[in-house]
Amino acid sequence: MYNEALYKVKIYYEDTDSGGVVYYANYLKFLERARSEMIYSTGLTNNKLLSDHGVFIIVKSCKIDYKSPAKFEDTLTIKSKVKSITKTSFVIEQIIERDSSMITYAELILVIVNKNGKPTKIPKDLENSLKKFSS
């Protein structure tokens, strides 16, 4: 059992503003990559979910709290875990750390939708994969 997924990010100049601080919207890209890698680590992909089940994952809600800025050449660790799973959605908690100290906290609600954009039941293989990252 995994319980939480870890993903490392190195901050490059392209990620920062003119002051060398990570531009706020770039944190969302880092979080997306970490969530995707969490799912990929179980053998699933977004393309597989679409081809096998006709579904994909969308972000319904994102709450983010920037506690301390990341800067040029920092190495960050993103910890991702599943807080809860319902029939059509799941909640992920993500923590970004620098040197083992939390600098950003995010909580997202993700919904499974069909090709018409309507919420639909989470496929069993995805549900089983998500459970590996829940407490």
Residue spans of the language-model regions?
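Hydrophobic beta-strand-centered segment that forms part of the acyl-chain substrate-binding groove
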Residues: 39-90, 104, 110
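Generic structural detector for well-ordered beta-strands
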Residues: 8-12, 65, 109-111
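Basic, polyanion-binding surface patches
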Residues: 93
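Hot-dog-fold acyl-thioester-processing enzymes
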Residues: 2-59, 115-135
